[in-house]
Amino acid sequence: MKVHRVVFREVDRDKYNEVVQGLKTIETRAATVKFKDIAAGDKLNFVCGKDVFEKTIASVRHYSSIDEMLAELPYKKILPSAKNRADVYEIYWSFPNYREKIESCGLMAFLLR
């Protein structure tokens, strides 16, 4: 079991709070080298500013695209604030360099318990 640090920008504190409150039960990240080897049973150490919260990963999935991920996982468990699927894209594209990272690496989905 390993512990991995996942940082939320202060501007994204709402998403950090959704993890803490149990509303966001699936954390996703671009499948870059930093995230692609994370396994079930590992822990994610969520950090936002000085706040830290830890969750255990129940399972891990890799998707080549947002479409592939949304065909299998409910978007409300990934981005509870999203109003619809189009909103999911808008939120993802708002993160720095995410479009390019997802197009080249895909997405990792960490189902939390």
In which residue ranges do the predicted regions lie?
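Catalytic phosphate/metal-binding cores of nucleic-acid and nucleotide-processing enzymes, i.e., regions
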Residues: 30, 34, 54, 77
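Contiguous surface segments at macromolecular interaction interfaces
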Residues: 70-113
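Compositionally biased, charged N-terminal/linker segments
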Residues: 1-38
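Short beta-strand-centered aromatic/proline hotspots
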Residues: 52-62
